[in-house]
Amino acid sequence: MAKSTSKTGRIAIIGASGYGGLQLVKLINEHPNFEISTLNGERSVGKNWNEINPFMKILQDKKITKSNIDEIALDSDYAILSLPNGLSSQLTPLLLKKGVKVLDLSADYRFKSLDKWKEVYTKEAAKYKRYDYELCEEAIYGFSEEFSSEISKSRLIACPGCYPTASLSLLIPFLKQGLIESEGIIVDAKSGTSGGGRNPNEQLLLSECSESISPYGVIGHRHTAEIERIASHFAGHEVNLQFTPHLVPMVRGILSTVYARLRDPGLTAEDCKIVIEAFYKDQPFIDILPVGIYPATKWVKNTNKVMISVEVDKRNGRIVLMSVIDNLLKGQAGQAVQNLNIMHGLESDIGLPKITFYP
């Protein structure tokens, strides 16, 4: 890793009023190498941040402003976009043209093919006209543990989704080394309600989701295509898998369980644990649990950690991989700051929490 850049990085947070934006404000405000230069948010334009968020006062109070590309370019080195899908693509080309590096938390640049994005995000494609084919090709997928070299040289990072982060952290080591069959992979994931965002949503009302668990997006969830794209990249051929998300009555956290068939049925759980440990050696945010101990979302809450466990079912030759993340940190804002650290020439873990408050 390169030495720390002496200059403090100036960060514009665009879309600061959502849950992802709130996490970003906290992380950047407390970061030793970055400062908040601009806070944009359509909900509270003209109001001071500390006035509308008394529970999260920042060191240097900022007024919420509308996005003005020229003003952002004057006082920002980086812009982190925490915006709805489609909207980021309307600002990103303008920011890049002004020399501002962009980290995008939406799905707008997660596909190398703009046509594929339009196929997956049909409603957004109808609403926002896009012709930025070259930027889709240029963008680096921000899975920090695997693409750090590319991230360090890039001006545009497509930060992964929360479900893909949890699921790909399990799949990549085994697909890249050809240790599992690429057919018949099942990804079963559970998420807390904050993954649905801060806007009103009947499904996320307390009386609707409390004391209940339910699947959604069973066939064709948008993250399926994202997981398959990156899985195919590491497998070296097309991967078609089954992904089913579930909503559980908690605020934050994701549990992802992956089922796949081992190419070598003689591999044990200990063997597979060694594979993961070797693959993620020296990665500060990946924790591998002993065989027989299974991860809980509470163990990573309010951290940027991924906690992984593995089992092998000898009866059918299947591997069972489990991971937990905090969907708002490692699954969103924390991973963005991890990528920002890499872009700025810092160690990837600076300014990011590693230990939960427990219980």
From Swiss-Prot:
GO terms for molecular function: N-acetyl-gamma-glutamyl-phosphate reductase activity; NAD binding; NADP+ binding. Its EC number is 1.2.1.38. Keywords: Amino-acid biosynthesis, Arginine biosynthesis, Cytoplasm, NADP, Oxidoreductase. One of its GO terms (biological process) is L-arginine biosynthetic process. Pathway: Amino-acid biosynthesis; L-arginine biosynthesis; N(2)-acetyl-L-ornithine from L-glutamate: step 3/4. It catalyses: N-acetyl-L-glutamate 5-semialdehyde + phosphate + NADP(+) = N-acetyl-L-glutamyl 5-phosphate + NADPH + H(+). CDD domains: AGPR_1_C, AGPR_1_N. It is found in: Cytoplasm. It comes from the Bacteria. The active site is at C162. The keyword ATP-binding does not apply. It holds the Pfam family Semialdhyde_dh. GO terms for cellular component: cytoplasm. Belongs to the NAGSA dehydrogenase family. Type 1 subfamily. NCBIfam families: argC. Catalyzes the NADPH-dependent reduction of N-acetyl-5-glutamyl phosphate to yield N-acetyl-L-glutamate 5-semialdehyde. This is N-acetyl-gamma-glutamyl-phosphate reductase. It comes from Prochlorococcus marinus (strain NATL1A). The gene is argC.
